Amino acid sequence: MTPRIEESKARKLIGVSCHMSILNNRTAELWSGFRPRVSEIFHRVSPDFISLQNYPEDYFRHFDPKKSFEKWAAVEVLEVSNIPKGMQFFELPAGKYAVFEYKGTSSDPRIFQYIYNEWLPTSRYRLDHRPHFEVLGEKYKNNDPNSEEQIWVPILDY
């Protein structure tokens, strides 16, 4: 699987966040609280959802499944106004990304093993310390094997 390389503009997101780890995965809880309220958000760029991970700087240097990171359930907006109660604004910085078109269940770790253990070490890129995110469009079906999503990995040239 070869990604496309894309320069992304800065994006304005509105959503909810929590801290979790791989072992203490609270993704379902996060999304179950967010999805019913998404109609409260105005000026959406598209109907897509953004699942974002904001990792500490040393997260990938010393991987530990108990290490905490910030997870977001969000949507992109054109302008930030009237943020619904209990939600927050997040500015996703501009930068270069490797974008993987993934088809499969959201719980299958093999795609991430491929990206970080096979593709990245043999590419001409290195991981950048910016948020990682997934774009969940109309073909996203969570744990359905026919589900489709885009996985955006922040990169820098060597």
Where are the regions a protein language model picked out?
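A solvent-exposed interaction/effector surface
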Residues: 1-158
